């Protein structure tokens, strides 16, 4: 039984993989103020609720984009499972060739997604991860990680509009039926959501052209993250949504790096 931990800016996703399938997954809030003891209590409660025995965990792997939380999480792993976790970072075996100017700058989440996408599809790809930030990554058919781009996530865009425009309210991210709206709330929803979809479509179009100019076949576009399905339902530039892409990548990296 393998424990997979994906630490994002907003949430931590934990998954349990056993006998070639996922048997449990949880989402908890990312909180850098929590101690290792607090995380230990929370994780043990999740295991108890799922009727899982911590002693059955053979290994743990962690991917994190929040450096100041790692001390607490690594200590939690040692306390709860009496094991050293594998941490995604410089020196880890990935099976892909990172073509970034400084490979150490590539976020762990982007590496994990790229590994999963390449291992599963073996074709030129654009990977979009709709998280707190939205990331776009380009992978060649040979497994070269060419790079990509990062932009504010949909929720960040909504929060910024509320915080910087005095008369605009905080809104729920719901998709209105029209882009010609007749009240403030739906006008904001339309501008944020449909404007965001337009941004995704342009970036994908531009990335496809640049990759094909390098001699790649037309890339397959794979999306993951919390709002992937919302965007997918409104555009034809995304070929597939894979909600478990990051957990799949962590499992692959664990197998490549376990002793």
UniProtKB/Swiss-Prot annotation:
Task: Write down the Gene3D superfamilies for this protein, in alphabetical order.
Answer: 3.30.420.40
Cofactor requirements of the protein: NH4(+); K(+)
Primary localization class, coarse: cytoplasm
Record field: catalytic activity: (R)-pantothenate + ATP = (R)-4'-phosphopantothenate + ADP + H(+)
List of residues binding substrate: 100, 107-110, 184
Residues recorded as binding K(+), renumbered to this chain, are: 129
Please list the residues that bind ATP.
Answer: 6-13, 132
Cellular component aspect of the GO annotation: cytoplasm
Keywords, sorted A to Z: ATP-binding, Coenzyme A biosynthesis, Cytoplasm, Kinase, Metal-binding, Nucleotide-binding, Potassium, Transferase
What does this protein's record comment on cofactor binding? A monovalent cation. Ammonium or potassium.
Q: Active site: which residues?
A: 109
Enumerate the subcellular locations listed in this protein's record, separating them with semicolons. Cytoplasm
- Similarity-based family: Belongs to the type III pantothenate kinase family.
Name assigned to this protein: Type III pantothenate kinase
